[in-house]
Amino acid sequence: MTSTINKPLDGEGSVQVKQDPKINIEEGALVIAVYGKGGIGKSTTSSNLSAAFSKLGKKVLQIGCDPKHDSTFTLTHKMVPTVIDILEEVDFHSEELRPNDFMFEGFNGVMCVESGGPPAGTGCGGYVTGQTVKLLKEHHLLEDTDVVIFDVLGDVVCGGFAAPLQHANYCLIVTANDFDSIFAMNRIVSAIKAKAKNYKVRLGGVVANRSKDTDQIDKFNERTGLKTMAHFKDVDAIRRSRLKKCTIFEMEPTEDVIEVQNEYLSLAKNMLENVEPLEGNPLKDREIFDLLGFD
């Protein structure tokens, strides 16, 4: 006797978070999800990219999707309360909240929200992200937004933290020119390829970060069909900007700082005008092991 096993739909047979069809970000906004290995500089990249978009005259919203809620502090110059903390204070009666309870204005008018997350080992971060978008929609805070950036926790690609991919047009992957970062990037490419079957999200490209060279990234890109959209070398001014709790656009305009600022502005312009949706083809783990390294 034989039986047929049907392929599960998105979110079936797992702990994935299904997207509520009523929770969508308005058409017309450019929505970018930023992923990458933990500690690779996603929040720095996201915040400086948000600042760059604002410099181009765009209305920008950055949503931090990490329980550490440290995505936006270089924009706001402080640690802001999270959506989940604010909702708990009103017993999750969102109608009692005002926009300034959970959304904070940062550098050059960038609006900042930290979704936060459940305590470690409990709940689902993807649910929190969905509730954050729902709250923003209830208060009509997405209607006039030009660019939305999701800054996502580490390299977790479970259904929960893949939730921003359900809203995004493009995903940018931040990586360094090393094995561990590229290995994590490959896993993220796999997640995006899976989500792209059911949602509009596509790969926007790679951001090379904290790397003098990009030879290993270039090898991976050539094999998988990816493209480097920006390259940020290991510039001390970027590290110092984090310590000063500000964006790179607020630093003293030295030659290094201006070079980094121009690279962020170029990335923002390309995401607005010249981004080409990429069809990434992830490698098997053994293939990455054999590909990377010195000949």
From Swiss-Prot:
Catalytic activity: chlorophyllide a + oxidized 2[4Fe-4S]-[ferredoxin] + 2 ADP + 2 phosphate = protochlorophyllide a + reduced 2[4Fe-4S]-[ferredoxin] + 2 ATP + 2 H2O
Top EC group: oxidoreductase
Residues that coordinate or bind [4Fe-4S] cluster: C124, C158
Binding positions (Mg(2+)): S43
InterPro entries: NifH/chlL_CS, NifH/frxC, P-loop_NTPase, Protochlorophyllide_ATP-bd
Cofactor note: Binds 1 [4Fe-4S] cluster per dimer.
Pathway field: Porphyrin-containing compound metabolism; chlorophyll biosynthesis (light-independent)
GO molecular function: 4 iron, 4 sulfur cluster binding; ATP binding; metal ion binding; oxidoreductase activity, acting on iron-sulfur proteins as donors; oxidoreductase activity, acting on the CH-CH group of donors, iron-sulfur protein as acceptor
Keyword 4Fe-4S: yes
Binding positions (ATP): G39, I40, G41, K42, S43, T44, K68, N209, R210
E.C. numbers: 1.3.7.7
Keyword 4Fe-4S: yes
Entry function: Component of the dark-operative protochlorophyllide reductase (DPOR) that uses Mg-ATP and reduced ferredoxin to reduce ring D of protochlorophyllide (Pchlide) to form chlorophyllide a (Chlide). This reaction is light-independent. The L component serves as a unique electron donor to the NB-component of the complex, and binds Mg-ATP.
Subunit structure of this chain's protein: Homodimer. Protochlorophyllide reductase is composed of three subunits; ChlL, ChlN and ChlB.
Protein name, per record: Light-independent protochlorophyllide reductase iron-sulfur ATP-binding protein
Organism: Prochlorococcus marinus (strain MIT 9215)
Lineage summary: Bacteria, Bacillati, Cyanobacteriota, Cyanophyceae, Synechococcales
Gene that encodes it: chlL
